[in-house]
């Protein structure tokens, strides 16, 4: 197993069990390509159906906090969506809540050369709904 596959399996197990892990022993995300590779491997290791995607660090302030200069994206897993009124156990590493706008698409937007214009994206949106994200870390941090 490669270092990347090992780290992906560790992250997937922590996510699946809502447990905390010690910080990963070796850096594997030296650049965007390595981070994307780790994310893809962890998603594959989880094996959970993906219900949608989220974006983060969409403002300069959020990017400064996250030590990045660009927004990033990640999957929203189907087994992590709850309807209004659901009782949810807070995971270890819980850090807080974030209020979000969730966009429900009326049709898939397949990846394509050149991407999409804003007007093409707007007509693909079926609904805008409120959402609440439970923010949690998977790594044991100082004071946790």
Predicted regions and their residues:
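Catalytic-core "active-site belt" of small-molecule-metabolizing enzymes
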Residues: 2-144
């Amino acid at each position: 197993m490669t270092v990347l596959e090992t780290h992906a399996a560790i992250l997937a197990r922590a996510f699946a069990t809502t447990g905390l892990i010690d910080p990963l022993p070796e850096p594997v995300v030296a650049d965007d390509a390595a981070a994307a590779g780790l994310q893809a491997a962890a998603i594959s290791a989880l094996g959970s159906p993906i219900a949608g995607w989220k974006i983060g660090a969409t403002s300069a302030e959020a990017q400064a906090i996250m030590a990045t200069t660009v927004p990033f994206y990640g999957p929203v897993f189907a087994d992590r969506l709850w309807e209004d009124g659901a009782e949810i156990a807070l995971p270890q590493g819980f850090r807080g809540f974030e209020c979000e706008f969730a966009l429900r698409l009326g049709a898939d937007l397949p990846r394509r050369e050149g991407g999409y214009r804003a007007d093409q994206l707007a007509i693909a949106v079926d609904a805008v709904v409120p959402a609440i994200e439970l923010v949690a870390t998977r790594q044991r941090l100082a004071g946790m």
